[in-house]
């Protein structure tokens, strides 16, 4: 049995297997051919943090795969009253076939997976957002993008996930953050170790122009994530100059695409003009959450 907590847990071949499976299932969905890969199975969806795309994509995905999704907020569970994570994991995994968690702390996810009888999927944690990266890479493949990626902004869970994807698949990744907002040192070190095997190229700087120059893919994330509202004014000051605007985007490769995991805050991490110019790519990326996650779930089910 396998869990899907971080892309670092998988080989290049395994990641591509999931991507290829997602592409196959997406083609079937386009002609309304929904095969019951997960017939009569139940996915428990546990949300400590709210989300539009995560809930809708997993719930619709399970329905299209012949299964059922059960939504559970922290208020619906005894976790909110102090029940140990390990006990909740034991109970839920005895009744549900798979679990997806969107949590504040990655350690919560790891504890749940440790005591779960069935596969556990990371729907988002403070350290990683791997399902989003599966959608992003599926979008890159569909668009025929090159493999030079520029990530501009906060060295957060999205930056960490790009580090894992790039280092596993042998991509070139350039990350530009303000000083003091670099990716976690241990995660960066692991990515650099992976890169020695895969041939990936990883660069860090504090200069957005340097990162974007010649990039095939430009991506960013919100400067103020959920739970960081008290830091908003400070962050907005320190991220000045890191907005992906027309001038910055003009430095990328001629046919470069722009990706954003959403929600986007126009005028902050991305300008209105850049967002609207690349809206087709961004919303294709959002829809690919549905297809990429179906690929992940079916793959995990096959590995029991």
Curated annotation (Swiss-Prot):
- Which compartments does it reside in? Cytoplasm
Q: Give the CC-aspect GO terms.
A: cytoplasm
Show the GO MF annotations. Answer: amino acid binding; ornithine carbamoyltransferase activity
| Superkingdom | Bacteria
Q: Does the keyword Cytoplasm apply?
A: yes
**EC numbers:** 2.1.3.3
The record's listing under Pfam families reads: OTCace, OTCace_N
Q: Catalytic activity annotated for this protein? A: carbamoyl phosphate + L-ornithine = L-citrulline + phosphate + H(+)
Q: In which pathway does it act?
A: Amino-acid degradation; L-arginine degradation via ADI pathway; carbamoyl phosphate from L-arginine: step 2/2
Q: What positions does the entry give for L-ornithine binding?
A: 157, 221, 225-226
The protein's UniProt keywords, in alphabetical order, are: Arginine metabolism, Cytoplasm, Transferase
Location (main, coarse): cytoplasm
Binding-site positions, carbamoyl phosphate: 51-54, 78, 102, 129-132, 261-262, 289
Under InterPro entries, the record lists: Asp/Orn_carbamoyltranf_P-bd, Asp/Orn_carbamoylTrfase, Asp/Orn_carbamoylTrfase_sf, Asp_carbamoyltransf_Asp/Orn-bd, Orn/put_carbamltrans, OTCase_ArgI
> Tell me, which GO biological process terms does this entry list?
arginine biosynthetic process via ornithine; arginine catabolic process to ornithine; citrulline biosynthetic process
Cited HAMAP family: OTCase (MF_01109)
Q: Which family does it belong to?
A: Belongs to the aspartate/ornithine carbamoyltransferase superfamily. OTCase family.
Function text:
Reversibly catalyzes the transfer of the carbamoyl group from carbamoyl phosphate (CP) to the N(epsilon) atom of ornithine (ORN) to produce L-citrulline.
Q: Which named protein is this?
A: Ornithine carbamoyltransferase
Lineage of origin: Bacteria, Pseudomonadati, Campylobacterota, Epsilonproteobacteria, Campylobacterales
């Amino acid at each position: 049995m396998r869990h899907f907590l971080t892309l670092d847990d998988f080989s290049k071949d395994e990641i591509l297997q999931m991507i290829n499976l997602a592409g196959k299932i997406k083609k079937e969905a386009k002609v309304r051919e929904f095969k019951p890969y997960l017939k009569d199975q139940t996915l428990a969806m546990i949300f400590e943090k709210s989300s539009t795309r995560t809930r809708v994509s997993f719930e619709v995905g399970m329905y299209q795969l012949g299964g059922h999704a059960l939504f559970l907020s922290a208020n619906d569970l005894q976790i909110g009253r102090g029940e140990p994570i390990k006990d909740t994991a034991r109970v839920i995994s005895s009744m549900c076939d798979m679990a997806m968690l969107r949590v504040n702390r990655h350690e919560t996810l790891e504890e749940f997976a440790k005591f779960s009888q069935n596969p556990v999927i990371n729907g988002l944690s403070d350290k990683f957002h791997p399902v989003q990266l599966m959608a992003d890479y599926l979008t890159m493949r569909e668009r025929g993008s090159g493999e030079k990626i520029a990530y501009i902004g906060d060295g957060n869970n999205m930056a960490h996930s790009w580090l894992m994807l790039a280092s596993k698949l042998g991509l070139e990744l350039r990350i530009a953050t303000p000083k003091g907002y670099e990716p976690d040192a241990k995660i960066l070190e692991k990515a650099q170790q992976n890169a020695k095997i895969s041939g990936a190229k990883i660069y860090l700087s504090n200069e957005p122009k340097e990162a974007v120059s010649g990039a095939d893919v430009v991506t960013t994330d919100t400067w103020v994530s959920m739970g960081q509202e008290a830091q908003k004014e400070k962050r907005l000051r320190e991220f000045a100059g890191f907005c992906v605007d027309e001038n910055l985007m003009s430095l990328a490769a001629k046919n470069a695409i722009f990706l954003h995991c959403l929600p986007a805050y126009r005028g902050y991490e991305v300008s209105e003009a850049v967002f609207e110019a690349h809206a087709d790519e961004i919303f294709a990326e959002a829809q690919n959450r549905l297809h990429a996650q179906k690929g992940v779930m079916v793959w995990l089910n096959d590995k029991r």
